[in-house]
Design a protein with these regions (language model features):
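AMP-binding/adenylate-forming catalytic core of the ANL superfamily
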Residues: 104-114, 121-123, 275, 387, ...
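Conserved AMP-binding/adenylation subdomain of ANL enzymes
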Residues: 207-224, 234-274, 288
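Conserved pre-ATP/AMP-binding loop-to-beta segment of ANL
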Residues: 17-18, 32-33, 151, 155, ...
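Conserved ATP/PPi-binding loop(s) of AMP-dependent carboxylate-activating enzymes
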Residues: 357-361, 373-404, 440-442
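Conserved AMP-binding/adenylate-forming core of the ANL superfamily
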Residues: 16, 36-88, 105-110, 158-162, ...
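Conserved AMP-binding A3 loop
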Residues: 45-49, 184-208
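Structural core segment of the AMP-binding/adenylate-forming
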Residues: 64-65, 93-162
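Gly/Ser/Thr-rich phosphate-binding loop
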Residues: 249, 264, 269-277, 286-350, ...
Length: 543
């Protein structure tokens, strides 16, 4: 009989028992003149000493503004050097950073600010077609705890980053008071109840996860990492930024949002040795019409995560992009995020058919979804993980925390997986109905809850259907209320118009079908599997 599907990650290298600020100071002392941040779209270049000086000034400015440890500060911006500056300045003084997705609309922004109790918000003035200044103003009366908003590059921002010499001693005093187990970050992950949940992460959680993601890539102070993935997500701020600062490597920001050409240009111009992305990003880069004009020979490693990588794509990444040591990671926000990772020397098969083995200091197991018993290797069950990386809980939501983390400390991911005899893990599906669109995790129930606010919708069900570009797209089945005199919701365009400005663009259903009934089980439950099968056939999609 096969052994049980449970593995313990390596323990030979100790966990970092530091705060993020302590770790940054250590790196600055070691490599003060190394490039810390190169932001090409801002024409900006900071050494580690430059960066640290700015972090200290902003930290003192935040204290002068009245913030104190454990206060929450929201950050709403695409990828700028200033995002990283705020990330480390808040960590320096124990202020909890609340990441806000740049794609959020007013409905989601107000919820995140209120649920986390943000006193302070720092934001870009705008992004793409979103006027953040106007959007913040529109929710001001809905966010009573929000005392102040400062926009990048405004006079208020310039005053904030200039710092306050009177508070510099307070910054230094706080160093001895902060604990690695203090909460330092809240990241929102949508819940099946329709309400986002704030995964609360500590210094220990995210510093160590970033450090070990870097260790498994063999990062050193000579590496230069191109980070086109968003900072608001763990992929950018933990696996990217914290992996770099804990190793003295350089963070290269190609653009404020993903752009294949700018990413390739950044790698070529800055001689990057590492590149991050979800598979769709690598596919877009490989397909770029002028791909061959960029010299990518400096590349060695990186991380691909967020969705399975097709074998053909992995081969091209290795052969055409020189990413011979690229690694695959699996994780979730609630686990800081990485639980498993492949190694640079792993075979092509391991890097396309599995998500690697247990991360250092992380335990993993495959459990029966109903009984919770550990299954034998080779059997499909729920992927569970335990260790330093598991969040302290969902912010002010003990019920949901208890549902996710059992009494033995195991985080139940909701993902279906199989563990091989060698300890590698294959993710084979999801227990929940989560849809993954271009690396973004979307929970249909959240979209359904919002669509129910339309006055003409009686019932709505949202599913994921296959898509060649994004992996999956959202589809809404809608039953309208009967006997409407002059219905306004009659087309897909009508639905898109209703969603515009209220929910993130990637949450707006790509397909809509108006129905009179839904497929049901004999006990009255919606059969989403049948809905998906019917939709695929009706739309002529390839599975």
């Amino acid at each position: 009989m096969p052994s049980l599907a449970i593995e313990m990650g390596a323990r030979d290298q100790p966990l970092l028992a530091q705060t993020i600020g302590d770790n940054l100071r250590q790196t600055v002392a070691r490599v003060p003149n190394n490039d810390a941040i190169v932001s090409l779209h801002q024409d900006l270049r900071w050494t580690y000493q430059d960066f640290y000086t700015r972090v200290q000034r902003l930290a003192s400015g935040l204290l002068a503004a009245g913030l104190k440890p454990l206060d929450r500060l929201g950050l709403w911006s695409p990828n700028y050097a200033e995002w990283i500056l705020v990330q480390y300045a808040t960590a320096e003084i124990g202020v909890v950073l609340v990441n806000i997705n740049p794609a959020y609309r007013t409905h989601e922004l107000a919820y995140a600010l209120n649920q986390s109790g943000c006193r302070f918000l720092i934001a870009a003035p705008s992004y793409l077609t979103s006027n953040y200044q106007a959007m913040v103003a529109s929710v001001q009366d809905q966010t009573p705890e929000l005392e102040r908003t400062v926009f990048f590059w405004s006079p208020e921002w310039e005053a904030l980053i200039a710092g306050d010499a009177q508070y510099q001693a307070s910054v230094e005093d706080l160093r001895g008071q902060l604990n690695p187990d203090d909460p330092i970050n809240i990241q929102y992950t949508s819940g099946t109840t329709g309400f986002p949940k704030g995964a609360t992460l500590t210094h220990r959680n995210i510093l160590n996860n970033g450090y070990f993601v870097g260790e498994l890539q063999r990062l050193t102070e000579q590496d230069r990492m191109c980070i086109p993935v968003p900072f608001y997500h763990c992929f950018g701020m933990v696996m990217g930024n914290l992996a770099c600062t804990s190793h003295g490597a350089t963070m290269v920001i190609p653009s404020d949002g993903f752009d294949a050409a700018r990413t390739l240009e950044a790698v070529s111009q800055e001689r990057c040795t590492a590149l991050y992305g979800v598979p769709t990003m690598f596919i877009a880069e490989l397909a770029f019409e002028d791909f061959t004009k960029f010299d990518l020979s400096s590349l060695r490693t990186g991380v691909m995560a967020g969705a399975p990588c097709p074998v053909a794509v992995m081969k091209q990444c290795i052969e055409r992009m020189h990413l011979r040591e690229v690694t695959i990671c699996y994780g979730m926000t609630e686990t800081s995020p990485v639980s498993t990772q492949t190694l640079p020397e792993d075979s092509l098969v391991h890097r396309t058919e599995t998500v690697g083995r247990a991360h250092p200091h992380v335990d993993i197991r495959i459990a029966h979804p109903e009984t919770g018993e550990t299954l034998p290797r080779g059997e499909t069950g729920e992927f569970c993980t335990r260790g330093y990386s598991v969040m302290s809980g969902y912010w002010e939501d003990p019920v949901k925390t208890t549902e996710a983390i059992d009494e033995a400390g195991w985080m139940h991911t909701g993902d279906l997986a199989v563990m091989g005899l060698d300890g590698t893990v294959q993710i084979v599906g999801r227990i929940k109905d989560m849809v993954i669109r271009g690396g973004e995790n979307i929970y249909p129930r959240e979209i359904e809850e919002f669509l129910y606010t339309h006055p003409e919708i009686e019932e709505v069900q949202v599913i994921g259907v296959p898509d060649k570009v994004y992996g999956e797209q959202l589809m809404a089945w809608i039953k309208r209320k009967p006997d409407l005199a002059s219905p306004q919701l009659v087309s897909h365009d009508d639905l898109k118009a209703f969603c515009a400005g209220k929910i993130a663009h990637y949450k707006v259903p790509h397909y809509v079908q108006f129905v009179e009934t839904f497929p049901m089980t004999v006990t009255g439950k919606i059969r989403k599997v049948e809905m998906r099968a019917r939709s695929i056939e009706a739309l002529g999609l390839e599975v």
